[in-house]
Every structure is written in C-alpha cells, then in structure tokens.
C-alpha cells in the first residue's frame, strides 16, 4: 500500500486529493485501485500516513517516541576494526603455514584476536573471552566466537609458537619487498621481563632492572629494520649473557634472510660487541656498528691524550673541547681515530656528560668520606664489642652502593679498645676498630680520563679517496638512532602489557612474546601512517588509538514493544577525517 494523490485546479490554484491505494497486476498490466479516499491533507499529515504505511508493510519497523527508546548496551568496535584492518592489509593470516587448526576458529584467527586485544585493551589470556563478549569483536570479524575460551587459547598458543619462523619470514618478506632500503641498517637489542611463579624452565634469576630483582626472568631479543619493523625475535633464559645471544641472529640474517653481502649493517648496544661476534658478522659478509663499554676503551688502543688536563672552568663552568675534535651537535664532538688493528674507532666527547661525571664522582667521594668519619666516631663510642667481618662488610657495601668500590683499596680495621664506665661504677673494655682506607689515585686518574668519552666501533673500514667511504657522521647517527629499538621494548612492556608473564610453559612464553611483537608491528604501522599525514609520533602514547575509542555499537530498544535495533555510533567529524586520511575510511560499520 502507498499514499497516492490526484490534483485539480480551481481559480488558478492547484489542490491535492489523497487516497490510500495499492498496486496489483491484471495479466501483464500493472494497475492501481483505491482502498480509502482521504481527501485534503496537510504536508505533515501526509508524511505521518506515509510513515504508518511503511511500518505496516515492514516487520522490522515500528512507530515509537524518542522518550520510549532505551539503550540496552554498547560495545566498543572502531579501535578493534582499525587493528583488524591493519592485520588484513599485511595479510598476516598467510604467515601461519604449519599445523594450522582446521576449525571455525583456526590458529591464525586466534592469533589475530590475541593481537587485537594487545593493541586495544590488553588483558590476560584467561580474560580474553570475556573481553570478546563485551566488545564488538564478533561484528568486526563476522565470525562465531562461542568456542573461544581459555582452553582454546592455550591450545592455540602452542601452534602459534610452532609458526614463529614462518611469521618472521612473512614480516621480513613483506617489509623487504615494500622497502629494500630499510634493511641497510638493522638494529638488535635485548631487554628483560619477569614472571609470577617459578614453573617456567626458560626463566632464571638474572641481572634485570630494579623491577625484576628477586624474580625469575627471561631475556627478550629483537631485530628490527631501519623503519622500526621487527622481523626476528627470541626468548632466552634470564641468566644468558647478552654477548652470547647474537650468533643465532647473525646466522639467520645470513642463511634465512639472505642479507649477507648486501651492504647490511647491524647496529647493537655496547655490551654485545666482542671479538667473536665481530668475526661472526664479518664471516656473514655484513657490517656492524656498536660502542665500547667504559672498561673496554683504554685497552682498545685509541689515543686518550687529548683528554688529559681537561677540567671545568671555575668561572664560566664550561669545558674546553679537545684539539682535533669536530662538532656533531651541541652534545657531541668527535674524532675519527681510523683503523686500529682491523677495527675502526670514532672517539666521541660529550661536554655535558663530562661535567656530570666529574660532579657525580666528587659528590660520591665526599658522601663516603662523611660516612667514614661518622662510622669511626660511632666505633670510638661503641657500647658493645664490634665484629670484624660485619664492620668491614658495612664499609664495602657503602662503597658498592655509591658505585665507587674500584676507587678504594680494601679497608683496614685497626683494633682499638673503648673504655666504658658502667652504672655500678665498674669499667668494661669494649673491642672496636678504627677504619683506614686508601684511595687508588691511579685508578681515579685513569677513570677521569674517560669522563664524557664514548667510543664507536665499526668494521666500515673501506677507503674512498683520502677518507673513508662511510663517513663518521653516518656511523654516529646509526648508533644514536637506536631509540627506535628502545621504542619496541617500551611499547611491548608499557602499552601491550607483556610483563609479568602469567604463562608457564616455554612454548606459551615464546608465543606470548610473538603476539606482542605482532601487536607492536601493527602499532608501529599505524603510528607511521599517522606521522605520514603530519601528526606526531603517537607510538608510545595512549593517543595512538584514542580517536577510535568510544565509537561503539549500541543496542536500542523500544520500551513499548520490546523490539530492538543495533546501530553503530555516528563518527565524529575529526575521526571520520582521520580515517579517510590514513585510508581506513571503509572500516566504519554502516550496517549490522
């Protein structure tokens, strides 16, 4: 049925006469018959009747009032849709090639769900099914999630770990194909994470940072390209020496990723460089850039004479720049020391760090001297016998706390007798000590020579004309650009909530790290996309997904009839514009 009308003219005015009619077929001819004649109607009345007819003919439509509409629930969806679309753009389903579960929830789908959760609202694997029910995940993925439970997740974690190498290969091939030049420099680094519990064989007590002390740990390694995208990662026992973790990665770069003999440079932090690792990289026909630890500088053979006699001017508080050093920026001056043996060394000098090193050392020495005076004063007034070992340990521990143990010889405890008069007027002899400790002035002098000094090391030794083919600026910049790999660990720990681990088997620990790397990969790509349109780097910020939060699917109900309808919240103009600019305008749901 529909609202029909006919027109007539009277005294040059046009009048409409309305009726309710319906169409029917007479053989092959379409005809119309009038059911009710209504006559003259206002425009508002005509619109109301059209609405009534529309409702009558459609079971999913109802006439109601705004005040009778209630919101039954809302479920977040847009941030999930963004992460899901980025997963699809990189075709990450194809990264799973080995022993994939053949079910409505295959291995790659579970991995996708876990990755999206890490990107948008990280929680434990036990809580993921509850998170899925509370969000619009089902609408975004368009799949049945009724079989998603913690048993299913733990089952698939084993299979996710079995696919680690194929995932690494997929990320490498995808990023290398897109930008081969992004592998001219690759970065390698490690960090630690800790456990709740003691059951995992991979975990061990190690040298992690403060938050890891007293907890079993694992060592996490990652290789990233020059754009910050990860392509290989590992989990090592927590007590593994960093210097021993590089071999497998270099072998993979040479054999699996075929990066040998392609002018690829591995950049890694001080502490990882060793003669064996340097030889390993050269055998793979690759280059490396690193820096020396403070205790490696003097034995390296670089000339430290330019730093002799340097001091902070008492009037200007400035430091003279050593002769022959060129400016890199306000915080670094450098001198290319050339090749010593088979390695190239570039000596750096930071005047700000020089002043800090000098000030910190002087302050620590003064603090210890004050402590020693007080300790001797207390020993001279001892009320009870003092023990030799306990007294000596207390002095050494204070030196260790101040990190100046190397500046002093072992403390000498000279026995003394303290005469103590008791309340009954008798006298008692108390055994105590006077502490003497000598400063190693030669050690302090040698250490002062390294204040503000850093040394970059590389095997970029090829000559070009009168200089080197690779300029010192390039080597320094590559090393100082390590912040991109520090971003990986900051994102994985602080935003993807990697730590602490709540799983126990080796395979599950490695799979959780793999999921976090996949989530970081997606976050890094989204961050780069937003940077490409002129926005800030939101990688390690809650602002990365903020424009897509609170864009929900709402279930609306008519309180009179009980009928419900599900609608996606209308996009704010700024969010809609952002999605269009990063080519994600299609992810917003229009129909459910």
Q: Can you annotate each of these PLM segments?
A:
Residues 2-5, 15-17, 27-28, 33, ...:
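Anion-binding and metal-coordination hotspots
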Residues 1-109:
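Conserved glycine(s) in the ABC-transporter nucleotide-binding domain "signature"
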């Amino acid at each position: 049925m529909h609202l029909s009308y006919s027109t007539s003219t009277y005294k040059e005015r046009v009048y409409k006469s309305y009726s309710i009619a319906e169409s029917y077929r007479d053989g092959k001819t379409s005809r119309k018959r009038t059911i009710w004649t209504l006559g003259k109607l206002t425009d508002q009345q005509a619109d109301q009747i059209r609405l009534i007819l529309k409702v009558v003919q459609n079971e999913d439509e109802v006439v109601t009032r705004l005040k009778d509409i209630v919101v039954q629930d809302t479920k977040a969806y847009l941030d999930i849709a963004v992460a899901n679309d980025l997963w699809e753009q990189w075709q990450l389903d194809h990264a799973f090639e080995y022993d994939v579960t053949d079910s409505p929830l295959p291995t790659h789908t579970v991995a996708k769900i876990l990755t999206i959760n890490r990107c948008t609202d990280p929680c434990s694997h036990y809580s993921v099914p509850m998170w899925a029910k509370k969000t619009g995940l089902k609408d975004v993925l368009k799949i049945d999630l009724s079989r998603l439970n913690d048993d299913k997740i733990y089952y698939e974690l084993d299979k996710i770990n079995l696919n680690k190498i194929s995932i690494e290969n997929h990320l490498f091939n995808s990023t290398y194909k897109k930008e081969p030049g992004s592998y001219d420099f690759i970065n390698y680094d490690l960090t630690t994470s800790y456990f709740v519990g003691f059951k995992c064989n991979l975990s061990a007590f190690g040298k992690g940072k403060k938050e890891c002390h007293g907890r079993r740990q694992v060592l996490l390694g990652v290789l990233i390209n020059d754009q910050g995208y990860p392509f290989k990662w590992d989990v090592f026992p927590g007590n593994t020496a960093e210097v021993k973790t590089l071999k497998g990665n270099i072998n993979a770069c040479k054999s699996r990723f075929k990066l040998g003999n392609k002018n690829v440079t591995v950049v890694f932090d001080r502490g990882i460089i060793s003669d064996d690792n340097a030889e390993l990289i050269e055998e793979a026909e690759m280059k490396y850039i690193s820096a020396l630890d403070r205790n490696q500088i003097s034995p390296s053979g670089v000339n430290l004479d330019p730093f002799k006699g340097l001091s902070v001017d008492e009037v200007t508080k400035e430091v003279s720049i050593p002769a022959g050093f060129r400016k890199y920026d306000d915080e670094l001056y450098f001198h290319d020391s050339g090749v010593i043996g088979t390695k190239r060394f570039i000596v750096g000098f930071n005047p700000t760090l020089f002043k800090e090193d000098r000030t910190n050392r002087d302050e620590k020495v003064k603090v210890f001297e004050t402590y020693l005076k007080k300790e001797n004063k207390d020993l001279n007034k001892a009320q009870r016998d003092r023990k030799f070992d306990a007294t000596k340990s207390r002095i050494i521990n204070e030196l260790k706390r101040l990190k100046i143990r190397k500046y002093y010889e072992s403390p000498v405890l000279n026995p003394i007798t303290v005469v103590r008069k008791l309340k009954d007027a008798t006298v008692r002899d108390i055994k105590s000590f006077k502490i003497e400790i000598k400063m190693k002035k030669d050690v302090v002098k040698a250490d002062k020579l390294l204040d503000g000094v850093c040394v970059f090391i590389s095997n970029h030794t090829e000559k070009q004309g009168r200089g080197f083919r690779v300029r010192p600026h390039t080597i320094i910049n590559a090393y100082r650009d390590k912040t991109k790999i520090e971003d990986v660990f900051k994102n994985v720990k602080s935003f993807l909530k990697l730590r602490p681990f709540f799983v126990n088997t080796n395979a599950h620990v490695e799979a959780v790290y793999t999921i976090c790397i996949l989530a970081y990969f997606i976050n890094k790509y989204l961050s780069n996309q937003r940077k490409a349109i002129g926005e800030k780097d939101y990688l390690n910020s809650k602002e990365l997904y903020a424009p897509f939060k609170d864009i929900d699917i709402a279930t609306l109900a008519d309180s009179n009839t009980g009928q419900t309808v599900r609608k996606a919240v209308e996009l704010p103009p700024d969010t809609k514009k952002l999605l269009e600019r990063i080519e994600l305008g299609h992810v917003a749901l229009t129909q459910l």
